[in-house]
Amino acid sequence: MISGAQQYRDKFAVRALVAHNDVAVMIEQCFLVSPQYVCMICEEVARNLKYKLVLMDKNNIQVLSGMKDACVLSALDAVDMVVSTMAGIARLQPIFSAIRVGKKILLANKETLVLSGQLFMTEVYKYNASVLPLDSEYNAIFQNLSVIYQKKLGQVSLSQYGICCIVLTDSGGVLYKITRTKLFKITPVQVYIHPNWSMGLKISVNSATVMNRVLEYIEAHHLFNVSSNEIEILLHTQTIIYATIRYSDGSVLAHFSTPDMKIFIAYAMAYLNKIKLNNISTYSKQYEIYNTYCGNNTLNLDILDTKNYPCLQTAIDASNHSQDSVIVLNADNEVTVEAFLCEMIAFIKIPNFIYRIMNTLNHFQEPSTIDDIIYIDHCIKETEIRYAIGN
């Protein structure tokens, strides 16, 4: 996103940047795009940032702090587009502030819709905001939809537009060929090394357990207004086909791409236009595309076995049950993954912990506000799950 704003300064200007506590990255981005405002959620960190920016002759940038200021920035009149990339439950408040003044939301994380579900989409309709997914699989689906459907995202059913099913693909993660015996000894470093994507530690673990795709399954339910029998997840280790749409007349549309997030970011930034970000491969002839993607091999798609990926069925059951179950699942997974990264539990035990906690701690009421969502998330993360893992 930052590189796109740099490359197309005549089209995009960054008004504000918001982060939690990473001063070094914020300073770097301030030099790259010169925002008018920056906000650090932690007040002490904001003071440190302001001091360093003044020393670097960047005292023209106004430094703010706290969640309240983050919400103000996301609703600024001068802002047309808000990119949601913040991690954690805190991301919800600034995004809802942007929605309530009708902003265009570029959704880069899965958890926003996973946590807030129908509440999020209801607010989007109510305030005439719009949503553009940045996540590769959903961006791929979105690109294959008609503009009419895109404009009514989440409000209409697939069948109204002749679509019978959307198909997500999953690489199977870096461990998909590893035997069960060896999984007991898998370390966080081994999970981190993915053959096709460069990802953070948590996302790498979620990829290996297929929880990434699980969250996307839940996200699809709200974003595209689809039922469980209108979504399929297939194993596709080559990571070439990101998603397909199956139409009622028997035709199938697929999105092919190299594993480069810049392609999906460029599409969302310049929606209904096309721009090319630097360092993205292009192909002058059709056969070059075919040879690059297929070569002498076939494109492999297979059923994703829930026996090998038990998190998948647990999540499907949670999404079919209730929104509070989904919030419990997300918090449950975050703490369990953290336990693995800290080497408190074995990798193979992750699905067991998630399943056990889902079946013992799922006793909350259906959330109707952001505060309800935050309360459930807090209860699971700070008390019950930590106790369960510790014992």
UniProtKB/Swiss-Prot annotation:
It catalyses: 2-C-methyl-D-erythritol 4-phosphate + NADP(+) = 1-deoxy-D-xylulose 5-phosphate + NADPH + H(+). Pathway: Isoprenoid biosynthesis; isopentenyl diphosphate biosynthesis via DXP pathway; isopentenyl diphosphate from 1-deoxy-D-xylulose 5-phosphate: step 1/6. Its cofactor is Mg(2+); Mn(2+). It is an enzyme of class 1 (oxidoreductase). One of its GO terms (biological process) is isopentenyl diphosphate biosynthetic process, methylerythritol 4-phosphate pathway involved in terpenoid biosynthetic process. 1-deoxy-D-xylulose 5-phosphate binds at K110, S136, E137, S171, H194, S207, N212, R213, E216. NADPH binds at N109, E111, G200. Its EC number is 1.1.1.267. Mn(2+) binds at D135, E137, E216. Keywords: Isoprene biosynthesis, Manganese, Metal-binding, NADP, Oxidoreductase. Pfam families: DXP_redisom_C, DXP_reductoisom, DXPR_C. GO terms for molecular function: 1-deoxy-D-xylulose-5-phosphate reductoisomerase activity; manganese ion binding; NADPH binding. NCBIfam families: Dxr. Homodimer. Belongs to the DXR family. Catalyzes the NADPH-dependent rearrangement and reduction of 1-deoxy-D-xylulose-5-phosphate (DXP) to 2-C-methyl-D-erythritol 4-phosphate (MEP). This is 1-deoxy-D-xylulose 5-phosphate reductoisomerase. The gene is dxr.
